[in-house]
Each structure stands twice: as C-alpha cells, then as structure tokens.
C-alpha cells in the first residue's frame, strides 16, 4: 500500500532536496565552522607536510638541533657501529686535552683535527636519522592540530533526534550515540547507524574532495576530527578517549617506539660482527707495533710505534660506518615515504614485508569494483523509447536512498533523458512507495498532466506479478534482456508504468578505472593477484576477466579467505591483502601485509597493519614498491659501505705504519702527500660520504619492476663497483686540498 511520507521524514526532505537541484557538492563549497585551540600556532596541514622537500628549512633546522641531542650515550648505544665512533671521538678528545698538557703522543693539532672529524661523523649520522624523523614529527604535529575541543550532541534515544544532550567529545565512551549535523565536527571515531552525509576528511587525508558516509555497507566509518558538510548522520562511538584512530595515527607516525625489522636486525648483527672483528684486529696492532719497534731498535733501526689517535682513525675508517650511520635513517625514511603516499603503517615490519610479497588477495567489493551496484544502462521494452524508460526509472528512484537508487537518478541525468518538470512534480504531491521484502518493489504514485501513474521498479518476477494483476503482459524481449543481464554478472531491475513494462535497468559492479593496467604492473613484479568474492562463478569470472586478475575464487565465505591465506603462507609465500569490510577483518589479521581502506569499517582498520587514507586499493602497488625500495636501499648502501673500505686500506694502512714499516709505502698507490694527510683524508672522506649519501638514504634507490637476479646484478655494478672506485679520487682530492692549504 502506498504511503504519503510526513514532511519531517528524511526521505521527503531528501526528495525535496533533489527536486530543488541542490547538490551535496554545493554544501561542500560553503565555508565550514572550525574550532581551534586558543593561541595555538597553526600546524602544517597533512598535504603541506607531504609536499615538504627533503631539505626544507622546516625539517633541517630541527634536525640539526636533534643531532646534538642524540649525542647522549643512551641514544648512541642504540647503534653499535656508531657507538664505537662515539667512543673513539671521546678518546681522541681526551688525548688532545692531554697533548695540551704536555703529554702528547702526536701533535696536538693533528689529534684535534682527527677528533673534530670523528665528532662530525657522529653528528652527520644523527642528522640523517633526525631528517628522516622530521617529516613524521611534522605529520604528528599536523594531526595534533586536528584534535579539537567540541561539544558532541549525545542522543539518549536514537529515535528522538530533537532531544540531544551536550557533552564534551573527550568524555564520550564506546557505545555512545551522537547526532552530527552539517557544519559539525565529528566528535570521535564511530559507525554511522542512520543517515547519509558528505564529510570533509581533508584534515587527515589531505584530499579536499568530500566523501560520502552512510549507514550500512562498507562506507559507514567516520573519523574523529573530520567535518560533516551536508545533511546529518547518527553515529555510534567506537573508541574510548586516547584509543581513537587519530590517536593511533599520531603514535604511529611519531615512531617513538619504533622496533627494528627482522632484516634490519639481521644486518645490524652482521655489522656488529664486522665491527668486533676489526676492533679486535686494531687493538692487537698497538702491542704488535711496540714489539716491532723494539725488534728493529735491537737491529739498529730507529722507528716509532703507531699512535692511539691513528689506531682510532684506522678503526673508524675500516668499520662499516657509512651503512651504520644511515641504517636507522633508511628504516625511518621508509615509514616516512609510506606516509607521503598517504598510508599509515603500524610498523616497519609491515613496510619491509611489502617488499617481499608473493601473492596479493583482493576483495572484489570496494577494492576491484566501486563496491556498490550502479546503473550502467537502460534497456527499453519493445515500443518504448530510452527517454521514456529513463524518466520512469528516475521517478521511481527519487525517494530511493540506496546506492543503487541514487545511481539510477545519476545515470538518467547524465544521459539527459530525465525531462520531467520538477516544479510540477513537487506541486503534484507525489506519494512514494518504499521497498519492502514482501513486495520487492519501490516506486511512486504521481499525477503528471491529466494521467495518473503508478511507477514501480523491482525484481523481474515481482514486476511481472504486479503487471499481471493490472491486466498487463510481460514481453518476452524483456524476459530475454533480464536473463542476458544476469548471465553477464549484472543485476536486472524491471520498471513498469501502470500495466505497461517499460524496460530493464542493468545494475553492475563497476570495475575501477585503470585497475587492469595496475594489475599488469603487479604481474611484471612477479606478484600473483587473486580476486576473492562471494558472487557466483559467472559473475566472478566476468569481473575477473574485465579487471585482469590472475585468478579468482567465487562464492567465498570469510573463512575461505582466511583458509587461503594460511594455505599460501604454509607454502612459504608472503601474502598481502586489501579490504574494507567487516567480513575482511579475520583475513586482514592473518595476512603478512594487510592494507585496510580508511573508508572501510572500524573492524577492518583495526585488523590491518596499514591504513590507506586515500582508500585506493591500487595503492598496494605503490606500497610494494616502497617496501622493495627500502630493502634495495639498505642492500645497496651496505654493498657500497663495505666496498669503499678497500680504498681506505690503501690510504690509511701505509700511513699508519709508515714509521714502523717504511716498506709499506709501496701500498701508497694514491701517492698521498704525508702520513698525516693520508690519515686525515681518509677520516674526512669517511665523514663526508655519509652527508653525500643522506639524500639517497632518505629518497631511496629507484625501483624498477625487474626480477630479483637482474636487480641484484644492476646494484652490484652500480654500488659495488662505485663503492670500490669512488674513494680513490675522493681521498686524493682531499689530500691535495690539505697539502695545498699547508694544513698537514
């Protein structure tokens, strides 16, 4: 039976809203009310933070200050390799003080020069790490600026929106029901349980385009600190104070408790082992040198033992200080690059795992497709024009607030076929017929001109029964169109006007633009893509073919996804998955790399180890590239660091033992001016190379979609050979400069 909705009903308000041709986007353009902390310095926005250049003053100045703060023993002890340099700096400083007091083992100026450059080496490593952390700190500051003190409108009874109780947002608890109207800030994380609204999430995502949040489905999550631009929603708070998504984001990007990843730990163990071996070897050189001097003295040859200052310089130049000084910065920069991609990762482990992914599982709904069935075309019945069908479908959908109903209205307008006089329609006081499980139809009763119309849309069998009752007939051509749409994986809706069948509206899951090309890139990387959906095999096969995935699993239940992930992991594969629905949460929790969409449900975001603020599942390709880039950068700089130690051998070994074993002068292939200049040149080069490699460590080695073997060969040629050859001209140029200036 038809219902005349009361004026206060949201459906009628929405229809009037549409008939007045007022779009949500117009509300988005209106100025929004904001609440800020009194006297607070406005932080950089999320978009401004991502646009900061690597060496922007906003990052460099704090990094220099932080580099001095990191000179504490506790901070230095976190990096064993640089801690050795730190101890060496202190030791040479003490030796310089002793030299000033007449207890010199070497000229005071030489000891001071070595000490200063050792301190520079430590500071340069600190600057690299501080620069990597700087962007994260700026992001955290911008997120803190979002947190505002607002008054929430708490509903004691969700059915009575006119009775609200003001309460501070900080006092909201999980389970509270709040009303959020146009212009209001969302007081806390929640799930929309009623209504639909346009929401500005730019404060968090950096994207100015508003998004739609509605009850039901996978787009029901709202985040505290965002702003409702139009309409209203009722939301259930899902997080207690201090546990919100914004709070967790701040904690993540600050990285105060950043743990080293497995690969980083393994590399640290390798570097520490090399450092210990070289430390023991260097320590034994002093007694060996003293013994050699005594032996040569007995033979009538005058020589002097190696000094502690030179031994410290030798040790620092031989241990892998380059990668040791940049290792932490590489890890932090990987997290920072992920943040620049608008992805929040819970840990470096997740970023690193992204670089080793073998299998990618994709939930169809909202990931490969837009997530809602959308009207794609009108198929008129014999004797009916597309215009007549579009007008009937448009009228029947005016009060339909489902995504499908809205898409029908949109398609009719896009085609320019909905030419009904909207003013006359509003004056006619139409009666809207809501959808019900019993009738499986919805529509409108309206008088247009002198004729009364009962326009309905719904399932084919429901419309067939309705038309038959009105003494109409259901054309065979329409039945064939219904079967054809279903066979292709779409959903057919039949539209009727009184006793006449007007035609079919085809609803289908629309595959996202550009998704096929992105899957081709994944395939080139060696990553297998698998689409998982609860649809039947026919629908799944159609969408899989259109999207270009490698494989698909149809009629899958949530436990099917979980079982497939465990099966792939049991075969030694790393599995990545994107998802946005509550049904994705168990699989997201099991996956090695679990990227939840920010537009998705709260359960999905809590289960994942990454959150994509742009809610773009194709972002996973970029995430994989960032993960691979971090691994490649770490490996490349390790290769470079170890390789360039070879050149330092030829510079510092002959210089260190020049007075003990003059014969070692034959190894001075670079023809360095003096032993002192050789030592100083090696120490200075060792410090400066960290500075020159900071941009590479922060920006990362450029990733190319090549096989692992090809990438390894390429990087060995560039960074292995480059690390071997570069120190020779570098040390020689520094030596020539020192000699020309007369400083050695």
UniProtKB/Swiss-Prot annotation:
A GO molecular-function annotation? P-type potassium transmembrane transporter activity
The active site is formed by: 363 (4-aspartylphosphate intermediate)
Q: How does it sit in the membrane?
A: Multi-pass membrane protein
Manganese among keywords: no
Gene Ontology CC terms? plasma membrane
The protein's matches in InterPro entries, at most eight in alphabetical order, are given as: ATPase_P-typ_cyto_dom_N (IPR023299), ATPase_P-typ_P_site (IPR018303), ATPase_P-typ_TM_dom_sf (IPR023298), ATPase_P-typ_transduc_dom_A_sf (IPR008250), HAD-like_sf (IPR036412), HAD_sf (IPR023214), P-type_ATPase_bsu_IA (IPR006391), P_typ_ATPase (IPR001757)
What are the transmembrane regions?
Answer: 80-100, 108-128, 265-285, 310-330, 650-670, 678-698, 724-744
- UniProt-annotated binding residues for ATP: 400, 404, 435-442, 457
Q: Which reaction does it catalyse?
A: K(+)(out) + ATP + H2O = K(+)(in) + ADP + phosphate + H(+)
Instruction: Write down the EC number.
Output: 7.2.2.6
**Chain segments annotated as coiled-coil in the UniProt record:** none
Localization, per the record, is: Cell inner membrane
Output the HAMAP family linked to this UniProt entry: KdpB
Q: How does it assemble?
A: The system is composed of three essential subunits: KdpA, KdpB and KdpC.
Matching PANTHER family, A to Z? POTASSIUM-TRANSPORTING ATPASE ATP-BINDING SUBUNIT
As for family, the record states: Belongs to the cation transport ATPase (P-type) (TC 3.A.3) family. Type IA subfamily.
Say what the protein does: Part of the high-affinity ATP-driven potassium transport (or Kdp) system, which catalyzes the hydrolysis of ATP coupled with the electrogenic transport of potassium into the cytoplasm. This subunit is responsible for energy coupling to the transport system and for the release of the potassium ions to the cytoplasm.
- From the Swiss-Prot or TrEMBL record, give the protein name: Potassium-transporting ATPase ATP-binding subunit
Q: What is the lineage of its organism?
A: Bacteria, Pseudomonadati, Pseudomonadota, Betaproteobacteria, Burkholderiales
């Amino acid at each position: 039976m038809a219902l005349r909705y009361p004026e206060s009903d949201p459906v009628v308000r929405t229809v009037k809203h549409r008939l007045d041709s007022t779009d949500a986007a117009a509300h988005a353009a209106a100025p929004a009310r904001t609440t800020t902390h009194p006297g607070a310095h406005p932080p950089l926005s999320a978009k401004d933070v991502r646009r900061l250049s690597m060496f922007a003053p906003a990052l460099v100045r704090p990094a220099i200050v932080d580099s001095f703060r990191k000179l504490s023993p506790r901070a230095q002890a976190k990096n064993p390799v640089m801690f050795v340099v730190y101890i060496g700096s202190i030791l040479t400083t003490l030796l310089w003080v002793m030299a000033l007091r007449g207890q010199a083992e070497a000229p005071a100026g030489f000891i001071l020069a070595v000490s200063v450059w050792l301190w520079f080496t430590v500071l340069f490593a600190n600057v690299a790490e501080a620069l990597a952390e700087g962007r994260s700190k700026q992001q955290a500051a911008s997120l803190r600026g979002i947190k505002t003190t607002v008054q929430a409108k708490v509903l004691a009874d969700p059915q009575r929106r006119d009775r609200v109780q003001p309460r501070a947002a900080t006092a909201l608890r999980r389970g509270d029901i709040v009303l959020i109207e146009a212009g209001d800030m969302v007081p806390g994380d929640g799930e929309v349980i009623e209504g639909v609204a346009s929401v500005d999430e730019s404060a968090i995502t950096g994207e100015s385009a508003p998004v739609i949040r509605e009850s039901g489905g996978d787009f029901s999550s709202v985040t505290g600190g965002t702003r409702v631009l139009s309409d209203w929603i009722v939301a259930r708070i899902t997080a207690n104070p201090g546990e919100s998504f914004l709070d967790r984001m701040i904690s993540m990007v600050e990285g105060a408790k950043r743990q080293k990843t497995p690969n980083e730990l393994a590399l640290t163990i390798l570097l520490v082992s090399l450092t210990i071996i070289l430390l023991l070897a260097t320590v034994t050189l002093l007694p060996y040198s003293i013994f050699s001097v005594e032996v040569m003295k007995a033979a009538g040859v005058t020589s002097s033992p190696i000094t502690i200052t030179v031994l410290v310089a030798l040790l620092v130049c031989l241990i892998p200080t380059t990668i040791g000084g940049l290792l932490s910065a590489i890890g932090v920069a990987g997290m920072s690059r992920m943040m620049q991609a608008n992805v929040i990762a819970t840990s470096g482990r997740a970023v690193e795992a992204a670089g080793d992914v073998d299998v990618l599982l994709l939930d169809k709904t909202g990931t490969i497709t837009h997530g809602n069935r959308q009207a794609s075309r009108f198929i008129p019945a014999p004797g009916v024009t597309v215009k007549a069908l579009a007008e009937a479908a448009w009228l029947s959908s005016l009060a339909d607030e489902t995504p499908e109903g809205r898409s029908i209205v949109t398609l009719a307008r896009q085609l320019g076929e909905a030419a009904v006089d909207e003013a006359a329609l509003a004056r006619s006081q139409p009666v809207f017929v809501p959808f019900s499980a019993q009738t499986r139809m919805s529509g409108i009763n309206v008088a247009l001109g002198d004729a009364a119309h009962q326009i309905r849309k719904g399932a084919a069998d429901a419309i067939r029964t309705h038309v038959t009752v009105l003494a109409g007939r259901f054309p065979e051509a329409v039945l064939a169109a219904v079967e054809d749409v279903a066979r292709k994986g779409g959903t057919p809706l039949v539209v009727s006007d009184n006793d006449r069948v007007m035609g079919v509206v085809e609803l289908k899951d629309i595959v996202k633009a550009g998704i096929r090309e992105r899957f081709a890139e994944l395939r080139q990387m060696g990553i297998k893509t698998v689409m998982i959906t609860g649809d039947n095999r026919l629908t799944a096969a159609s969408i899989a073919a259109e999207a270009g995935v490698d494989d698909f699993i149809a009629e899958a239940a949530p436990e099917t996804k979980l079982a497939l992930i465990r099966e792939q992991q049991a075969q030694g594969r790393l599995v990545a998955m994107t998802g946005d629905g509550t049904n994705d949460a168990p699989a997201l929790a099991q996956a090695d790399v679990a990227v939840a969409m920010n537009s998705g449900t709260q359960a999905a975001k809590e289960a994942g180890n990454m959150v994509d603020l742009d809610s773009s599942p194709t972002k996973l390709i970029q995430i994989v590239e960032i993960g691979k880039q971090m691994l490649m950068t770490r490996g490349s700089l390790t290769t470079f660091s170890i390789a360039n130690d070879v050149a330092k051998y030829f510079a510092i070994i002959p210089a260190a033992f020049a007075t003990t074993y003059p014969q070692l002068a034959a190894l001075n292939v670079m023809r360095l001016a003096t032993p002192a200049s050789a030592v100083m040149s090696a120490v200075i080069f060792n410090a400066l190379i960290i500075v020159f490699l900071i941009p590479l460590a922060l920006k990362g080695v450029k990733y190319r979609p090549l096989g692992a073997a090809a990438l390894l060969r390429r990087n060995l040629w560039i960074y292995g050979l480059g690390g071997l050859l570069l120190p020779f001209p570098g040390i020689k140029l520094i030596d020539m400069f020192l000699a020309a200036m007369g400083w050695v």
